[in-house]
Structure formats: structure tokens, C-alpha cells
Design a protein with these regions (language model features):
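Walker A (P-loop) phosphate-binding motif
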Residues: 1-28
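Residue-level signature of catalytic and energy-coupling elements of molecular machines
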Residues: 6, 39, 81, 100, ...
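N-terminal phosphate/diphosphate-binding loop that engages ATP/GTP or pyrophosphate donors
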Residues: 20-80
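Conserved catalytic-core segment of NTP-binding enzymes
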Residues: 23, 106-116, 121-212
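Short, glycine/acidic-enriched loop or turn micro-motifs at the edges of active sites
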Residues: 35-37, 85, 123, 184
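Flexible beta-alpha connector loops of hexameric P-loop NTPases
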Residues: 85-95, 150
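Conserved helicase/translocase P-loop NTPase motor core
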Residues: 95-106
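C-terminal lobe/tail of nucleotide-utilizing enzymes
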Residues: 164-280
Length: 280
């Protein structure tokens, strides 16, 4: 299960990783578990997959059953699908994730034969539905995606906290490592990974060509391409890295990775009094 802040590059990294794995002869299933349903867009050249939840609703109204052909699509050996979620303001995204996995089980999820199943999860939301793979030991490894900015590392740290909590409750899921995306060389993401005791699986540079090709829905993780070694390395590391129990940071520890001028870390908390609140 791959977690990260929205916009951190999870879908970009996963689309290229899954493509490279498939080209290496692995059977790969990529499942988008983000209500935005955009995990597979890069893989399919910008085209949107019909989501499992939306398709299920339409089929139910028509008195029909969902079949795998309705929701799973493939490109060059990568199988991919989107769970989907409710429309804005019309339901619970976390509950949608739970419902989506229930539908996957009806479709035979546990009987499918894949070498890797990659789950793309939004990390900003802390509700139980999005933590399902961690809470129920549904995945073998968690990977976090982040950059050299406080907000993406805040989300990565929260994911590490969730993993640590469920490990303390007897769970088995661990963090295999971190993908550093848009790496500008400032080093905060690497410092974070070291502090929480997880390895860096890959550092994808902040590069204009990568940004442009990603924006144009082009896969760069193709064997023989300029960026192929990056994703070949990532595929190897994802396969080999053992799930580890992280040591998440407290808020002050996270802020200490950055200079106070960048984060406002030198601001002091001054308690308010009742007189202050009343304007006295």
C-alpha cells in the first residue's frame, strides 16, 4: 500500500513502477484507492477508468452483476482499476474504500494470481477506511511518498504513526521505505527517512522533462529509456526491502528537519486569558 499527500506524486511513481515491473515479467495489479480516481490516468494516457463503485451502482439499478471486464483494464502487462468514491458532499470516502474492497472480494480478489498488487492511497485523510490495509493486515508493506516540504513529510509521518500504532496492537504491517519525489537536493526527505528509521527506496529528481512528460500522461519508466534505471532500481528495492517498524516523530521533531525561518518554528505559544477573550 502506497500512501502520500495529495499531489506528492504517488500516481506518477506507481504508474511508472507498475509498468517497469510488468516489463520485467511480473504480473502486476494497480488499484487506485483515492476518491479522485486518477491513479491510472497516467497509465492509460489520460483516459479515466470506470470505477468499481460507480459501475456497481449502475449495474445494481439495472439488476445486473458487475463482471471483471467492466472494471479492470490492461496495458502492456499492467492490470489496473479504480475503486472510486462518492461524489463531493454525498458520502464518506473511507466507507467507499471499504465498500470497494467488499466488491473486489466478490469478484474473486483473493483468488487472482499476481506477483504484486499495488494500492494507491490518499494519505491526507486519517479516517479508518483509508487505513484499512494497515489496520487489517491486508498489505505486506507500506511505502510512503514525499518531497522536501513540510506538508508531505507531515503526511508521511502520520502514516508511520498509524503503522506503529497497529504494530503495537499486534499487527504485522511495516514500512518498507520512502520514495522521494521532486527531489531538489535540499535533503529534508532523506533526513526524515533516517529519523523515522526507514530506507529511501528511490529519489526522483525535480526535473522539467519529467514534469512535462507526466503532465502529458507519458510513461517514463520504460526499459531502455533515459529514466529507466531509476525505476529499475525502485522495482528491485520495493521487492527486497523488508517491512520495518518505524519510529515516527513528534511535531517538534518534524519541524526540526527544517530551518525555523522556513517553517515558523521559532514562534512561541502564548496562552490567552479570559480577559483577552473578552477584549478587556
Amino acid at each position: 500500500a502506497i500512501y502520500g499527500k495529495g499531489g506528492s506524486g504517488k500516481s506518477f511513481a506507481l504508474s511508472n513502477l507498475s509498468y517497469m515491473m510488468a516489463q520485467q515479467g511480473k504480473r502486476v495489479l494497480l488499484i487506485g484507492c483515492d476518491p479522485k480516481s486518477d491513479t491510472t490516468s497516467l497509465l492509460f494516457g489520460g483516459k479515466a477508468c470506470p470505477t468499481i463503485i460507480e459501475t456497481s451502482s449502475k449495474k445494481k439499478l439495472a439488476g445486473e452483476e458487475v463482471s471483471i471486464e467492466d472494471v479492470c483494464f490492461q496495458r502492456d502487462g499492467v492490470f489496473a482499476m479504480e475503486l472510486g468514491g462518492p461524489e463531493v458532499g454525498r458520502g464518506c470516502g473511507g466507507r467507499g474504500i471499504i465498500h470497494g474492497f467488499e466488491l473486489l472480494e466478490k469478484l474473486g480478489f483473493h483468488e487472482w494470481g499476481f506477483d504484486y498488487v499495488l494500492l494507491d492511497f490518499l494519505g491526507d485523510v486519517v479516517c479508518g477506511g483509508f487505513g484499512l490495509p494497515i489496520a487489517r493486515d491486508m498489505c505486506q508493506k507500506v511505502i510512503v511518498v514525499g518531497s522536501n516540504d513540510l506538508q508531505s513529510l507531515y503526511v508521511a509521518n502520520n502514516v508511520c504513526k498509524a503503522v506503529e500504532y497497529f504494530r503495537s496492537m499486534g499487527g504485522n504491517v511495516g514500512v518498507a521505505g520512502m520514495i522521494v519525489n521532486k527531489d531538489d537536493g535540499t535533503g529534508e526527505a532523506q533526513a526524515f527517512a533516517k529519523a523515522v528509521d526507514i530506507p529511501v527506496l528511490c529519489a526522483i529528481p525535480a526535473n522539467e522533462e519529467i514534469r512535462r512528460k507526466s503532465a502529458n500522461y507519458q510513461i517514463i519508466g520504460k526499459p531502455g529509456g533515459e529514466w529507466a534505471p531509476l525505476f529499475e532500481e525502485l522495482a528491485i528495492n520495493v521487492a527486497k526491502a523488508p517491512p520495518q517498524r518505524p519510529t515516527p516523530l513528534e511535531q517538534d521533531g518534524l519541524l526540526d528537519l527544517f530551518s525555523p525561518e522556513e517553517t515558523g518554528g521559532n514562534v512561541q505559544l502564548i496562552p490567552a486569558s479570559q480577559a483577552d477573550m473578552r477584549g478587556g
